[in-house]
Amino acid sequence: MGLIFKIVMLFLFCGFLHSQQDSLTTNEYITTFPNKISTRISLVNTSNSFIINDVANNAKYELKPNVREYLGFSVLFRSIEIDYGFSPKFFNANKDNDNSRLFNLNIRTFLGQWMQTIDLYNQKGFYFSSNNQRVNLSGVKTFKIGGSTSYIFNKNFSFRAIGFQNEWQTKSAGSFVPSIYYYYTKYHLTLEDIDEKASSFDIAVGPSYYYNFCLTKNFLFSLGAHAGVGLNHSSNLGEGDFTSILYDFSGRAVVGYNSDTFFAGINSNIILLEHKIDASTVQDDTIPFLEFYIGYRFNAPKKWIKLADDFNKKYGL
């Protein structure tokens, strides 16, 4: 955490040393900032939770992590975004959760109209609830890695303006965005004499649609949703190995403010993966995400700009 914080602070300090010459370019629909580095600090509430529905016995069980809030730091330049988060103990949602942790890392890149995301969730310390009863399980760990590959059909629609804001939507537009999602999840339970491991792999494909509403020159409201279908393969979650149909859904709502150098907003998103782990048991794998953020843009070093321009020219991007 200390190293990442120092890097972000260094970027902000260097930004004040650079001249404030306007480096943005515009067209009718999108304002871009090709020669700017965007830095952002955010307060995030997120987790990877699991709900088990035992249809045969009409029972419902929830497994939710103790730690759900963290501070996030982001750095964006051209097509690359890197996010890092950590969970301070002094947050109300994280208090009294000794031996619990949440580590979250997100990477997003844009290559032309293609968008690639990579998500990582490493969690320790859950509580198990059923029939209004709650039990703390400090020995439960989960590790999830995966992401999505998407294609943005409408060149006049800016996905980068939704929360990430190294672009800005200057005229309302929407786009069809087909996506393929894939996640690998590993579970580890240690409790007294119990030491059990399980895993799950998800892959699904489906359509998405997003629309950016330009309320004023500086304010944006965005809505979007994705629905898909695919396959899940689980090992040792239910009755040994089990393969079933996977249904996935995601939704996003964003409110953003933007100026040449300063930006801020609220970014909300949810991902739901539903599948069976045996013939009569359904598992819902959910990742809710709520973020409040502020950010600042400054001029990128000339060497970075030249390197990016040379790369784009070489590969025709």
Give residue spans per PLM region.
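Transmembrane beta-strands of outer-membrane beta-barrel pores
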Residues: 43-49, 77-81, 86-92, 111-113, ...
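Bacterial Sec-dependent N-terminal signal peptides
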Residues: 1-29, 219-221, 294, 298, ...
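Outer-envelope beta-barrel architecture signal
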Residues: 33-39, 69, 78-80, 112-116, ...
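Surface-exposed strand-loop-strand hairpins of Gram-negative outer-membrane beta-barrel proteins
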Residues: 46-70, 81, 85-96
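Outer-membrane pore/translocation modules
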Residues: 26, 102-200, 269, 311, ...
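Residues on the lipid-exposed face of transmembrane beta-strands in outer-membrane beta-barrel proteins
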Residues: 41, 71-77, 105-109, 147-153, ...
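Predominantly the C-terminal beta-signal and adjacent terminal strand-loop region
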Residues: 249-250, 254-317
